C-alpha cells in the first residue's frame, strides 16, 4: 500500500521493518492487482491495473528511538521485528483522497481498518503493549 499523505514516523518501542516496492510492468499470469480506494468496510476500490508485477526496491529496519520519512506515493509494507511496536506518526497535508493497494487476487482482501476498535479496546492494547517487556 501507499498513503494519502507523506509522514514522519518515530519508533517509540520495538523494531519495525519497512519493505519498499515498485510496480515493474505486468504479466497475464500475475495474480496481483493495483487498486485505489478507501480502506473501510463496504467501500469500493477502483482497479488501477490488473496483472501487475512488482519488485522489492529496498528494506530497512528502524529501532526504538529512530525516525523515518515515507512519501505518499511509496508502496511499502511493514513487518514487526519485535513482539510489539509503538510508533508516533505525524502526517503531512493530504495529497490524495485514498491510498493504493497491491491486492493478491487469490486471497480475500481484509483491510486493517475495516473493523475499528472501541476506545476501550485501543487502551487495553496500548496498556498490554507497553507492559509486554516490563
Describe each PLM feature range:
Residues 1-3, 76:
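Histidine-centered active-site/metal-ligand motif
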Residues 73-76, 93-95:
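Short acidic/polar capping segments at secondary-structure boundaries
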Residues 4-18, 22:
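Short, conserved beta-strand element in jelly-roll/cupin
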Residues 22-72:
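Short acidic-glycine-tyrosine-enriched beta hairpin
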Residues 92-134:
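Non-heme Fe(II)/2-oxoglutarate
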Residues 8, 83-99:
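A short hydrophobic beta-strand segment most commonly corresponding to one strand
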Residues 82-83, 106:
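Mixed-charge (acidic/basic) macromolecular-recognition segments
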Residues 18-19, 76-81:
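Short beta-strand His + acidic residue motifs that chelate non-heme Fe in jelly-roll/DSBH
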